[in-house]
Amino acid sequence: MAASTASHRPIKGILKNKTSSTSSRVASAEQPRGSVDEELSKKSQKWDEMNILATYHPADKDYGLMKIDEPSTPYHSMIGDDDDAYSDTETTEAMTPDTLAKKLAAAEGSEPKYRIREQESSGEEDSDLSPEEREKKRQFEMKRKLHYNEGLNIKLARQLISKDLHDDEEDEEMSETADGESMNTEESNQGSTPSDQRQNKSQSS
C-alpha cells in the first residue's frame, strides 16, 4: 500500500515552481501592513551595541600589547651648523685611479693610526711592569704576531713545498741515472764471458 501512495504523489523537483512563488507573493500582498512589521521584528535580532562595546572593548583591556613608559630617544643635531660639515663627499672630487695609487704607495710604509696609539698606550703600561714581566710580555706579543701572521705563514709554506718538490725531482733524476748506469753494467756483464765477469768483480773489490 505504501508503494501505491508513493506512486500517486507528484514528484517534486529542486527548482521552485512559478505558480508557488506567485501565490506566496499574492498572499503577502493581501496581508495588512501591520502583520508584515510583526514578522520582520520576529525574524530580526536587535543588538545591544553598548553592552558589546563594554564587554569586548573595555577601557582597561590592553590586548596583550606592551606599554613602553620610557621616553623616546632625543635627537641631537650635528655640532657645528656649517653646511661644509655635513658631508665630505660633496666637497671632494672623484677619486681617480692614479691618485688612489699614489696615496696607497705613500701610506704603504706608515702604520695605521690605531696601531700607533696602541704602542703609545702599551709604553705607558710597560712602565708599571718589572723587567721580567716586560720581557715575558714582549715574547708573548712576538709569538702572537707570528701565530696570527697568516700571510707570512702561507709564503713560508709555499717556499717549503717548492723546496721539497725540487729536492724530490733531483732525487728522482739521480735515481734514474743510477738505474741507467746499473742497467748498462748488467748488459755489458751479460755480453761478456764468465771469466771476464770474474775479472770485473776482482777489480771492483
Swiss-Prot record:
What's the name of its gene? PPP1R2
Q: Which InterPro entries match?
A: PPI-2
Q: What is this protein called?
A: Protein phosphatase inhibitor 2
Sequence segments annotated as region (Required for binding PPP1CC): 12-17, 43-55
Q: Which PANTHER family match?
A: PROTEIN PHOSPHATASE INHIBITOR, PROTEIN PHOSPHATASE INHIBITOR 2-RELATED
**Record-listed N-acetylalanine modification sites:** A2
Q: What are the Phosphothreonine sites (modified residues) in this protein?
A: T73, T89, T92, T96
GO biological process annotations for this chain's record?
glycogen metabolic process; regulation of signal transduction
GO CC, alphabetical: protein phosphatase type 1 complex; skeletal muscle myofibril
Q: Which family does it belong to?
A: Belongs to the protein phosphatase inhibitor 2 family.
